[in-house]
Design a protein with these regions (language model features):
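A generic local structural motif
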Residues: 2, 30-32, 247
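Sec-dependent N-terminal signal peptides of Gram-positive bacterial secreted proteins and lipoproteins
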Residues: 2-28
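Structural motif marking the loop-to-transmembrane transition
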Residues: 4-5, 66, 116, 120, ...
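Hydrophobic alpha-helical membrane context
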Residues: 17-18, 83, 287
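Sterically constrained small-residue positions within well-ordered secondary structures
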Residues: 20, 35-37, 252, 344-345
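Active-site-adjacent loops and short helices of periplasmic peptidoglycan-processing enzymes
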Residues: 24-197
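Domain-terminus/edge residues, biased toward the C-terminal soluble/receptor-binding domains
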Residues: 163-167, 175-395
Length: 395
């Protein structure tokens, strides 16, 4: 009996010692109680992408192979080309033998055939949903003429984004010596991709079928299961190779708050998805959406001369919401900037914008419009007003 009691006490002491000496990774967030998050993956990062604030990180600058998360840069260059007008979603892409080959041998594939003609939008779906290496190669060749030239464009764009620890060797993420990036750099390119919201239409789709022009329809199933099972998830990209293990750049939005989680080197897809979900849930608990300016609300009364009736109301063209940390005491300020060089202002005409700052950081802006037709006071008008004031004061 005494022996059992000693064993019991010894066991309790071991548990107590283990709990006291365990050192979990902690959240990097100023001005709050630091929570504890356990991450098994080799590297991880949680960001609020609107401000770029890093909420959590673990080995965020460690160079690791990203597998198909590479395709975030491929999609970014494609979306930039679309949004700049360089290409259109309806443009046709002819699939090369090289593109088809990159989708064979057990690699992720959209099942494209040599000579097959697909639109830019269909190829984007193949990259975003099916993670097709053939689709990524077809897009690369269409945009830059060859995959080699496209990879140069990828690395050039990475440098401009400040991705200091990234080197791309291909457009798909296939294993290749020296093809590396970091969780932090992935967050940077993911943050930039989110500036092209059209892409979320593709990355947030779970299943899609492309049948036009084919005997056998192409069935696309998203490798990112979080878009189906995690509330608000609409992207961005998963990745796996035996070298990289399981990776993801995941994003979700709830109640106007968007978060971005990066996981690299998770041992299996269940842990990858669980840890990305845990990070995003933590992010949602730390931030909230605030409506700062309502559409059509008065922002500024703009005087156009010395006469009291020479003014217009600058109103907001649309709502402006911002994301702030819960409990933050940082001052929120509005700075209206109105064009005063015009002689005449038309009702409904855009006359400037209003900037919103949290502390000294610009977090958003909204266009302003005039609420009326009005002519600016001229020199003669102002002189007459001054004479009237002199006369009234004399009387």
């Amino acid at each position: 009996m005494k022996k059992n009691k000693k064993i019991f006490i010894f066991t309790i002491l071991l548990i107590f010692i283990f709990q006291c000496t365990a050192v979990p990774v902690r959240v990097r967030a100023e001005g709050e109680d630091k929570g504890e998050i356990q991450v098994e993956a080799s590297s991880a990062l949680l960001m609020e992408p609107n401000s770029g604030k890093i909420i959590y990180e673990k080995n965020a600058n460690e160079k690791l192979p990203p597998a198909s998360v590479t395709k975030i840069m491929t999609m970014l260059l494609a979306m930039e080309a679309v949004d700049s007008g360089k290409i259109k979603l309806t443009d046709k892409i002819t699939v090369s033998e090289n593109a088809k080959k990159n989708g064979q041998g057990g690699n992720s594939s959209m099942l494209l055939d040599t000579g097959e003609i697909r639109t830019v939008e269909e190829i984007l779906k193949g990259i975003a949903i099916a993670s097709g290496n053939d689709a990524a190669t077809a897009m690369a060749e269409y945009l830059e003429g060859s995959e080699e030239a496209f990879v140069k464009a990828m690395n050039d764009r990475a440098k401009k984004l400040g991705m200091k620890n990234t080197n791309f060797k291909n457009c798909s993420g296939l294993p290749e010596e020296g093809h590396v990036t970091t969780a932090y750099d992935i967050a940077l390119m993911s943050q930039e991709l989110l500036k092209h919201p059209q892409v979320l239409k593709y990355t947030g789709t779970y299943m899609e079928t492309i049948s036009e022009g084919r005997k056998s329809p192409i069935g696309l199933v998203n490798h990112n299961k979080l878009v189906r099972f995690f509330k608000g998830c609409d992207g961005l990209k998963t990745g796996y190779t035996s070298e990289a293990k399981y990776c993801i750049s995941a994003t979700a939005v709830r109640d106007g708050v968007r978060v971005l989680a990066v996981i690299m080197g998770a041992p299996n897809y269940k842990i990858r998805n669980k840890e990305a979900s845990n990070l995003m849930n933590y992010g949602f608990s730390k931030f909230e959406n605030k409506k700062i300016i309502k559409k059509d609300s008065e922002v500024e009364q703009v005087k156009l001369g010395k006469r009291e009736d020479k003014f217009f109301i600058a109103k907001a063209l649309e709502d402006l919401d911002i994301v702030v940390e819960r409990g933050s005491k940082e001052k929120i300020t509005k700075k209206p900037i109105v064009n005063l060089d015009k002689k005449y202002y038309n009702k409904g005409e855009v006359v400037g914008h209003c900037e919103v700052y949290v502390g000294d950081k610009l977090v958003g802006k909204v266009k302003l419009y005039s609420d009326r037709d009005i002519k600016k006071s001229g020199i003669l008008d102002n002189m007459l007003h001054n004479f009237r004031n002199i006369f009234d004061n004399a009387v």
